[in-house]
A protein has these predicted regions:
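Conserved short beta-strand edge segments in small beta-sheet-based binding/regulatory domains
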Residues: 167-177
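An extended, acidic, His-containing surface patch that forms the Zn2+-binding/catalytic region
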Residues: 176-215
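Conserved helix-loop functional segments at active or binding sites
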Residues: 103-110, 164, 200, 204
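Midchain, well-structured core segments that form catalytic/ion-binding scaffolds
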Residues: 1-149
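Extended hydrophobic-aromatic, low-complexity segments
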Residues: 132, 150-154, 206-208
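Short secondary-structure junction motifs
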Residues: 113-120, 170-172, 203-205
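Short amphipathic alpha-helices in soluble, non-transmembrane regions
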Residues: 153-163
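Charged catalytic carboxylate motif
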Residues: 96, 157, 193
Length: 215
């Protein structure tokens, strides 16, 4: 709960401050009586991928949440005029950012892990003018793999590719880790019990790891 209260919001402030602004008490986080009394918790969830449809099964039981990290990369170059700064004199941070997006896809595709994924779904260019070469370009990487070891390898490879791309453009890049959740195994006996109940009802039910971090 203490860590959750200090989580930063995109527009500034913390989760605790956002709760107070909504007339909620952040000290109540993690104090649910019923949650403390529960012997086990089972979440029913619509699949957010397409593993089951390809396997031909209507339901599956999750065995674990795959490891997951989010990193922020900041590329720093030189902001200049888009019309008068010729290519040899540019240090455009959007170039290594774009190359990092491509490198992220290539890295997971070549990793050998069929569950490895890397997504850059948010970018920010500053100062953000149409006729201005950006001086700073920031992107956020979401990466998930089957194992903790593979996650480290993939992130290291993407980071190295971004550094190489930044140097080639005469820019700098720095990375910050915003979150890291190791692989989380679910209780094996409970997983087996749920699978048994489902198989007695609907037939064969596979056990799969999941890439949805909230499970």
């Amino acid at each position: 709960p203490a860590r959750a209260r200090e989580l930063p919001c995109r527009d500034g402030g913390t989760l605790a401050e956002a709760w107070r602004a909504a007339d909620l008490d952040p000290d109540e986080l993690g104090t649910s009586d019923w949650a403390q009394q529960a012997g086990a918790m089972i979440e029913l969830h619509v699949e957010q991928g397409r593993a089951l449809v390809d396997m031909g099964h209507p339901l599956a039981v999750a065995s674990a949440v795959r490891p997951h990290t989010r990193r922020r990369a900041t590329f720093t170059g030189v902001s200049d005029h888009a019309g008068t700064t010729l290519l040899p004199f540019r240090h455009d941070p959007t170039i290594p950012l774009a190359q990092t997006i491509v490198a992220a896809r290539r890295t997971v595709a070549e990793s050998g892990d069929p569950h490895a994924v890397a997504t850059i779904g948010r970018t920010q260019l500053e100062p953000g003018g149409t006729n201005v070469i950006a001086g700073r370009a920031t992107c956020w990487l979401d990466c998930r793999t089957e194992t903790d070891e593979m996650l480290t390898c993939v992130v290291d490879a993407i980071t190295a590719a971004s550094q190489q791309a930044a140097e080639a453009e005469g820019c700098q890049v720095s990375w910050q880790r915003e979150s890291l959740t190791p692989r989380t195994e679910f209780d094996a006996s409970l997983t087996a019990r749920v699978q048994k109940v489902l198989e007695e009802t609907i037939g064969k039910t596979p056990i799969l790891s999941t890439g949805a971090g909230h499970d």
